[in-house]
Amino acid sequence: MAQEIDEVKALLTEKTIVKIANREFVVGKIGNVRCVVAFSKWGKGAATITATLLIQEFAVTDLIFIGTAGALADGLKVGDIVISKRLVQHDLDARPIISRFELPLLNRIYVNSDPELTELAGKAVSNLLERGVEHMVGEEAVKDFNLAPTLYFGDIASGDQFINSDAKRNEILKLLPDVLCVEMEGAAVAQVCLEFNVPFTVIRTISDTADHNARVDFGKFIVEVANAYSRAIIGEIVRLV
């Protein structure tokens, strides 16, 4: 959601707004690092356009995709953070021409995140969790959402579907058992970065359990938790650069 990056945009100084293709790109600096912040919009197609514009129009050298996701793996809980190792499109199926989930003409199912950028993101999140989640979101939000976040690294699946049933969750896990969480954009952005040879990583805050219990107050969670997580994580990444 657009609100997920409001606080990240607030970090920028020397801001300039550029509008292209019904998208708003906020150009500026976080600390001494030149940055461009944009809302990807929902779904793989929209995110592909946004990522391509970031690379082609703004010449970004690294791309960090941050937002929320639904948990698939057992044990993940609301407020946990997942950083990608690999990304896969769970709704991609061009059989019998190629294998299920395979990216056409790329001869691969998974796209790997950049190891150095992923390590940097992990260090940033670890630093923040060591200081305590209440420093990111405040004590009231910690109580309201029962936050006790854990950091995970692993596979993230993307598709043009909101997963909110046990049947769909179990179907994805049966075919892709290593996937930790599911969302709607990351793997498409990963493909763009792969083809343009731009290092990337994906950081996701778990907002729901992607099953029949997925009906949560997203607006409240986005404003009080995800937005604050994003600001803190991006700010800490920049501090570590």
Kindly label every feature range from the protein language model:
Residues 1-58:
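N-terminal short beta-loop-beta anion/metal-coordinating cradle
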Residues 62-64:
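Structural motif
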Residues 159-215:
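A C-terminal functional module that forms or caps the active site or interfaces directly
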Residues 35-40, 153-157, 203:
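Active-site-proximal beta-strand elements of phosphoester/diester hydrolases
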Residues 72-176:
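Mid-sequence, gly/pro-rich, charge-dense loop/helix-turn segments that line enzyme active sites
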Residues 7-10, 74-75, 92-93, 212:
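Short glycine-/acidic-enriched loop or helix-start segments at secondary-structure transitions
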Residues 210-241:
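His/Asp/Glu-rich mid-to-C-terminal helical/loop segments that flank catalytic regions of hydrolases
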